[in-house]
Amino acid sequence: MTDSPATAKIAVAAATYWVDRPFDYRIPPALADKVVPGVRVVVPFGGGNRRTEGIVLSLGTAQSGMRLKSIASVLDASPVLSPEMIRLAVWLRERYFCTVYDAVHAMLPAGLWYQMESVYTLCAGFDRESAYAAAGKSAQEQLVLD
């Protein structure tokens, strides 16, 4: 018999109120000592596996046969939320019609939040003039080249 993988229940930033619930994610062995309740993590979310920020609410083990996505990375060296703050966020969701993540967002300092952005660069040795010609009049493709 194999041990069940360690999991974390995570409130994700991308969830709306109607689908706001803790989502289960597998904890990779490399992150096992870093994933604790109250830390912020980056996880794949939705059908397109878009990376989004989440907050670990609790830890557990997976039921046999469950297919889970894995936590991509941990953003904090130590928890930014205490157990009391996590309970408060869950209570705020029920009382004030907001997501757990929105409640957490309101409790923590503004400079703490993580924002992802896509950065594109040309490969080394790529001819810039032929790239401009291939891009044509597309404003987005021209923006990537500039």
What residue spans do the PLM features occupy?
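Accessory, non-ATPase domains that flank or precede helicase/AAA+ motor cores in DNA-metabolism machines
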Residues: M1-D146
